[in-house]
């Protein structure tokens, strides 16, 4: 009888102190893709114990961002503030088992210990004054002082793990002082809550930013003290800005939802974020389904990745070009309305087919579509004077006359234009530019026959007649 492998369970555990930034979104994406690849479970946990900085608005921003990117969790969101009784229960068990202890040293006393260690050329740390040991007499308890609870970290040997991204990592336990796991008011600390959550939620694989590497040996030691099964850990390098510095607001948008506002497609964002620190051969473009199919931790990069706005624009432009015109129209329509345009004024799907090859974002598409979706404004006098010369007006009148009984397809319009050019000995710009100026009030548009077809025969003839 063969045993069934345990279900892989990953988690994303943001702190709701602001929006979901790009680094967090990429970490969530890797955890989501890993779980999906293995038919596992992706858990969302909100680490909201920082009461001063955590807000409901930030929680909602995280949920909105994940929903936009299509990374819905299988379980959660779970909130740490709703699990306080469980944390206190485990702390009580650890105190009972002797793997944690009360420490009455004041913050000033601990700082003095750290300074003394620095003076001796040692790593600054708590010196274990209140750590119980066989045969050791502890100091008298200071009157009226509430203790912290510290974890009794091993004092010899090393704590290591085979990191899914970086390979073997090890810390000498002498470098790790006894971590505070509960504050004087009894509230548990971040590193402790994370451990209990991962244990209770059965997390098997932790993918997170490499700023957490120093937390990992402490968390492993607490898990061992609890008799828990250890998850596998992987630490992903940070994202750098185009200048090689850590990505920050000065490099532009770092809030995921700002990219939605700027007209980036979630499909493109998922593709770009995944490629930023993970690879599948030379494939630059892949669907969400392909990401899930191909994802593995062996191809996560050990070195930092560089944010490249031009590359993101290239990826987004690809997805815009590939998208079905009707679907694209549905996504662009609200952006046209926000600009005061009427998406129903034109066959918007046809307009998308005409405009999308020139667009890098949905915002650019919406702006271009106003050509067809806003009330007609005659060309400015200066433009009309330059391009609507007497000769041009004669050619336009000829075109209008021929158009009266003609079919109004792009092909038929192109044939009309060619006939006028041939009969009058003109070159294309000598008719195409005046047509643009007369019909849409500007000199630059996509192919003039396509523009006229979309504007519609009646509107074109009315505008030419008004010259």
UniProtKB/Swiss-Prot annotation:
Region (Disordered): 124-156
Binding-site positions, ATP: 249
CDD domains: GluRS_core (cd00808)
Xref: Pfam families: Anticodon_2, tRNA-synt_1c
Gene Ontology MF terms in the entry: ATP binding; glutamate-tRNA ligase activity; tRNA binding; zinc ion binding
Record localization: Cytoplasm
GO cellular component, one term: cytosol
Motif ('KMSKS' region) on chain: 246-250
Highest taxon, organism lineage: Bacteria
Placement of sequence motif 'HIGH' region: 14-24
EC numbers for this chain: 6.1.1.17
Presence of the UniProt keyword rRNA-binding in the record: no
One Gene Ontology biological process: glutamyl-tRNA aminoacylation
InterPro entries listed in its UniProt record: aa-tRNA-synth_I_cd-bd, aa-tRNA-synth_I_codon-bd_sub2, aa-tRNA-synth_I_CS, aa_tRNA-synth_I_cd-bd_sf, Glu-tRNA-ligase_bac/mito, Glu/Gln-tRNA-synth, Glu/Gln-tRNA-synth_Ib_cat-dom, GluQ/Sye
Transport listed as a keyword: no
Catalyzed reaction equations: tRNA(Glu) + L-glutamate + ATP = L-glutamyl-tRNA(Glu) + AMP + diphosphate
Biased composition (Basic and acidic residues): 124-134
Predominant location: cytoplasm
Keywords: Aminoacyl-tRNA synthetase, ATP-binding, Cytoplasm, Ligase, Nucleotide-binding, Protein biosynthesis
PANTHER family: GLUTAMATE--TRNA LIGASE, GLUTAMATE--TRNA LIGASE, MITOCHONDRIAL-RELATED
Quaternary organization: Monomer.
Family: Belongs to the class-I aminoacyl-tRNA synthetase family. Glutamate--tRNA ligase type 1 subfamily.
Role description: Catalyzes the attachment of glutamate to tRNA(Glu) in a two-step reaction: glutamate is first activated by ATP to form Glu-AMP and then transferred to the acceptor end of tRNA(Glu).
Protein name (database record): Glutamate--tRNA ligase
Natural source organism: Bordetella petrii (strain ATCC BAA-461 / DSM 12804 / CCUG 43448)
């Amino acid at each position: 009888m063969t045993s069934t492998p345990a279900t892989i369970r990953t988690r994303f555990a943001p702190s709701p102190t602001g929006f979901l930034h790009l680094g967090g979104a990429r970490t969530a994406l890797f955890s989501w893709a890993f779980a999906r690849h293995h038919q596992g479970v992706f858990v969302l946990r909100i680490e909201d114990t920082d009461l001063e900085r955590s807000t409901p608005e930030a929680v909602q921003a995280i949920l909105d961002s994940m929903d936009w990117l299509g990374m819905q969790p299988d379980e959660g969101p779970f909130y740490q503030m709703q699990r306080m009784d469980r944390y206190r229960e485990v702390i009580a068990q650890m105190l009972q088992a002797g793997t944690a202890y009360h420490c009455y040293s004041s913050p000033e006393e601990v700082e003095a210990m750290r300074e003394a260690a620095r003076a001796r050329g040692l790593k600054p740390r708590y010196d274990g004054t209140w750590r119980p040991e066989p045969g050791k007499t502890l100091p008298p308890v200071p009157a009226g002082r509430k203790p912290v609870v510290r974890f009794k970290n091993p004092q010899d040997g090393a704590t290591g793990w085979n990191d899914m991204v970086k390979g073997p990592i090890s810390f000498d336990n002498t470098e790790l002082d006894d971590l505070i796991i509960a504050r004087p008011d009894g509230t548990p600390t971040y590193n402790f809550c994370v451990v209990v959550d991962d244990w209770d939620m059965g997390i098997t694989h932790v993918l997170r930013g490499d700023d957490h590497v120093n937390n990992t040996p402490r968390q492993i030691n607490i898990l061992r003290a609890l008799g828990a099964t250890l998850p596998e850990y992987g630490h992903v390098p940070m994202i750098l800005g185009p200048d090689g510095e850590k990505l920050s607001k000065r490099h532009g948008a770092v809030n995921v939802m700002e990219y939605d506002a700027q007209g980036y497609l979630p499909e493109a964002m998922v593709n770009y974020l995944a490629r930023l620190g993970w690879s599948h051969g030379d494939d630059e473009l892949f669907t969400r389904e392909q990401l899930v199919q191909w994802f593995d931790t062996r191809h996560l990069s050990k070195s930092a990745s560089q944010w490249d706005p031009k590359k993101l624009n290239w990826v987004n432009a690809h997805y815009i070009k590939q998208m079905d015109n009707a679907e694209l129209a549905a996504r662009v329509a609200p952006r046209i309305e926000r600009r005061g345009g009427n998406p129903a004024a034109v066959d918007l799907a046809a307009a998308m087919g005409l405009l999308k090859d020139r667009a890098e974002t949905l915002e650019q598409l919406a702006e271009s579509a106003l050509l067809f979706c806003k009330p007609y404004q005659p060309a400015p006098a200066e433009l009309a004077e330059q391009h609507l010369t007497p000769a041009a007006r004669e050619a336009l009148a000829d075109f209008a006359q021929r158009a009266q009984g003609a079919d109004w397809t792009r092909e038929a319009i192109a044939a009309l234009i060619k006939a006028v050019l041939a009969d009058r000995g003109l070159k294309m710009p000598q008719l195409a530019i005046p047509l643009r100026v007369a019909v849409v009030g500007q000199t630059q548009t996509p192919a003039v026959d396509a523009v006229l077809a979309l504007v519609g025969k009646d509107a074109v003839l009315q505008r030419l007649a008004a010259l």
